[in-house]
Curated annotation (Swiss-Prot):
Alphabetical list of HAMAP family matching this protein: ArgC_type1 (MF_00150)
Enzyme category, top tier: oxidoreductase
Taxonomic classification: Archaea, Methanobacteriati, Methanobacteriota, Methanomada group, Methanococci
InterPro entries documented for this protein: AGPR_AS, AGPR_type-1, NAD(P)-bd_dom_sf, NAGSA_dehydrogenase, Semialdehyde_DH_NAD-bd
Gene3D superfamilies: Dihydrodipicolinate Reductase, domain 2, NAD(P)-binding Rossmann-like Domain
Transmembrane segments: none
Residues forming the catalytic site: C148
Biological processes per GO annotation: L-arginine biosynthetic process
Protein name per Swiss-Prot or TrEMBL: N-acetyl-gamma-glutamyl-phosphate reductase
Length: 342
């Protein structure tokens, strides 16, 4: 039985980690940290996990990284905080899965430009998208868990850019549930403002844009012009991404579907739908990424749609999938559940 610590355990990703790990047979949560809630019972902040595993016995702790002695650490901290924590854990030889954006970029200047933070320096991290980097994840010590929007976007276009059958310009239109904004309420996420409403934000300047771009360029082995615009939906969970690209050659829809099925044939958590329409309820509370659409218009524009749960495949579920790969567990352990539909 391996032991786990969750640093920053009061937010939505920390909550989701606890819920999934409650059904994981190979690990036990030993520490959950929080500065502001130190000393409080875990189940006071997360009542939904009461009576599960050892959670009734746990209290939030205010631990320094040097005092953590578990096999695995999940950093569910805001951007910037991991820069002070991960290097210490890395030096100690502890396996780290970081859910922030702090170690997703090899180009530190790009990180600093988009996140507005001074980086403290590179460490040997691996970008934790299992469908692309599984072999590297197996040997990693620090795994940079992908962002929620990038997960759905990259997976939706990876087969096309890898096979070099679309032009360099790709556009992503994504719509996310409110939980993606985090546990702290804001003017934007306040119920009267988000209910029965839909609107875009950060039209051209969302920090996930370069993350999507760099990963697709890695697959394409060339420069791409990737554009991304997010929207906020009046729902709790889920990201629906509509991807647009232009085909380089005349290719039929059936051939496109075959390319996707071949690319993801060994990927349990990616489901390809030929005719069914993709929706959020199909993936809600699951670690699946559903991909469909594959429609081609008269101008050669192909439209691909993906759906994920932003808190699961877009965050905590993918982090646990990465842990499973890293530790040699069954990759599906704790995650073998379908979407909650309806």
């Amino acid at each position: 039985m391996k032991t786990v610590s969750i640093i920053g355990g009061t937010g939505y990703t920390g909550s989701e980690l606890l819920g999934i790990l409650a059904n994981h047979k190979d690990v036990e949560v030993k520490n959950v940290t929080s500065r502001k809630d130190s000393g409080k019972k875990l189940t006071k902040i997360h009542p939904q996990v009461k009576n599960l595993k050892n959670y009734n016995e746990l209290e939030f702790k205010n631990l320094n990284p040097e005092n953590i002695d578990t096999d695995i650490v999940f950093c569910a901290t805001p951007h910037g905080a991991s820069l002070k924590i991960v290097p210490i854990l890395h030096e100690m030889g502890i396996n780290v899965i970081d859910l922030s954006g702090d170690y997703r970029f090899e180009d530190l200047e790009m990180y600093e430009a988009w996140y507005g933070l001074k980086h403290t320096g590179k460490i040997n991290s691996v970008y934790g998208l299992p469908e692309i980097y599984r072999e590297k994840i197996k040997k990693a010590n620090v795994i940079a868990n992908p962002g929620c929007y990038p997960t759905g976007a990259i997976l939706s276009m990876a087969p096309l850019v890898s096979n070099d059958i679309v032009e360099e310009r790709i556009i992503f239109d994504s719509k996310s549930g409110v939980s993606g904004a985090g546990v702290e309420a804001t003017e934007t996420t306040h119920f009267p403002n988000v209910n029965e409403n839909l609107g875009p934000y950060k039209l051209t300047k969302h920090r996930h844009s370069p993350e999507i771009g760099k990963e697709l360029e890695y697959l394409a082995e060339k420069s791409l012009k990737v554009s991304f615009t997010p929207h906020l939906l009046p729902v709790t969970r889920g990201i629906l991404t509509t991807a647009h690209a232009f085909l380089k050659e005349d290719i039929g829809r059936a051939d496109i579907v075959e390319i996707y099925e071949e690319f993801y044939k060994n990927e349990f958590f990616v489901r390809i739908y030929d005719e069914e329409m993709i929706s959020l309820t199909g993936v809600r509370s699951s670690n699946f990424c559903d991909i469909g659409g594959f429609e081609i218009d008269r101008f050669g524009r192909i439209v691909v749609v993906s759906a994920i749960d932003n808190l699961v495949k877009g965050a905590s579920g993918q982090a646990i999938q990465n842990m499973n790969i890293l530790m040699g567990f069954d990759e599906k352990e704790g995650l073998n559940i379908g979407g909650l539909r309806p």
